Regions:
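Flexible, charged surface loops at secondary-structure boundaries
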Residues: 107-110, 164-166, 290
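A structural signal for well-ordered alpha-helical scaffolds and beta->alpha junctions
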Residues: 60, 92-95, 128, 178-182, ...
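Boundary detector for helix-to-coil junctions that initiate low-complexity/charged tails
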Residues: 1-17, 21
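Conserved alpha-helical substructure of the radical SAM core
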Residues: 18-146, 153-156, 318-324
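Accessory C-terminal segments flanking Radical SAM cores
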Residues: 216-324
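A broadly conserved sequence feature marking short terminus-proximal activation segments
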Residues: 16-47, 200, 245-271
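Conserved AdoMet/S-adenosylmethionine-binding subsite of the radical SAM
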Residues: 125-243, 247-252, 257
Length: 324
């Protein structure tokens, strides 16, 4: 699923140019250098990026868990790379291992705004009720949030509705332009005693056009990590639980999907993630999310552009710099 953009403002279809952040003000975030000019459009974009970055750091992050690799939509430029991911489901026993480690971290339940069950499309998972109960068993006071496109919600089983109600889950429904009665889905969830809202993965222009941001990746890793980190609308705010690790963002955590599909050579360095078994308390996660990561060098935020929502062609050009 693609994340809703809350970053630097985008106008028209032109690429956003996000240059050096306020380097003199963000030394604690790993940037270095001199303060920028103050009388240019680039400086304005820079200021916006920095302001958004600071707002993000004062908000509690979510911890996202992809319980399904694939999706029943096929969105171009999906930041979870679902259109090109091999179909697959997170096994409850694998999730339980991670939850057991997560539960041992002091203050972790209060630290995250919510544990988000997503994908891909989480409603495709045949063991979703069991997964919801696992999260509640290990994290009794955490907010559980199901993030879905809603297509399958009208056909949800009584078992699933009961589980979501009993664990106190929320439902975040992303309203894609598919002709579905999304207001009706919210009312359906409410009738089962479940809080549901519309929001999340799709942005809408002033003209009413649904769009994503295309966030191209530079396989060569020649981008400035500090600038990418400051400009990123996701880093440190939508953290990812994957294979016994916590990553600062979804796209960075799931780079292996690009390698598998396109033969790219993206790689993770030890500083790109936290091993669950090594985390003592939530303060360590907070420190981790506030700093640039080696993999930030892959994000070409200076080439971000707005694209109308539509189907993926599954071509490399949707995710990689320099591909046609």
């Amino acid at each position: 699923m693609a994340q809703q953009t809350r970053g630097p403002q985008v106008t028209g279809g032109e690429p956003v140019v996000v240059t050096s952040p306020w380097r003199s003000l963000v030394l604690s975030y790993g940037a270095e250098g001199e303060a920028p000019e103050s009388d240019s459009s680039k400086a304005l974009e820079r200021d916006r990026a920095f302001a958004h970055h600071m707002r993000r750091m004062f908000q509690r992050p979510t911890l996202d868990v992809d319980i399904v690799n694939h999706c029943n939509l096929n969105c171009a430029c999906c930041c979870h790379y679902s259109p090109i991911a091999d179909p697959g489901f997170l096994a409850p026993e694998d999730l339980e291992q991670d939850l057991a480690l997560l539960a041992q971290i002091e203050g972790v339940e209060e630290f995250f705004d919510a544990i988000c069950l997503m994908g891909g499309e989480p409603l495709l998972h045949p063991q979703l009720p069991e997964i919801a109960w696992l999260v509640r068993r290990y994290l009794p006071s955490a907010i559980i949030r199901l993030v879905t496109n809603g297509i399958l919600l009208g056909d949800a089983s009584a078992e699933l509705w009961e589980a979501l109600h009993e664990v106190g889950a929320q439902i975040l429904i992303t309203p894609y332009p598919t002709g579905i009665d999304y207001v009706g889905l919210v009312e359906l969830a409410t009738s089962h005693g479940i809080d549901a809202v519309l929001g999340g993965g799709l942005a809408v222009s002033d003209e009413g056009e649904a769009f994503f941001l295309k966030n191209p990746l530079d396989e060569r890793g020649e981008q400035d990590p500090a600038e990418s980190f400051i400009a990123c609308p996701l880093a440190g705010s939508t953290m990812q639980l994957l294979d016994h690790r916590i990553y600062p963002c979804n796209g960075g955590a799931l780079l292996g999907r690009l390698n598998e599909r396109f033969g790219t050579a993206f790689r993770h360095e030890p500083d790109d993630y936290l091993e669950l078994a090594s985390i003592r308390n939530a303060d360590e996660i907070e420190t981790f999310r506030r700093t640039k990561k080696p993999m930030c060098r892959y994000c070409a935020h200076g080439l971000v552009e707005r694209i109308a929502w539509g189907p993926s062609s599954r071509s490399a050009s949707e995710w990689l710099v320099g591909c046609s």
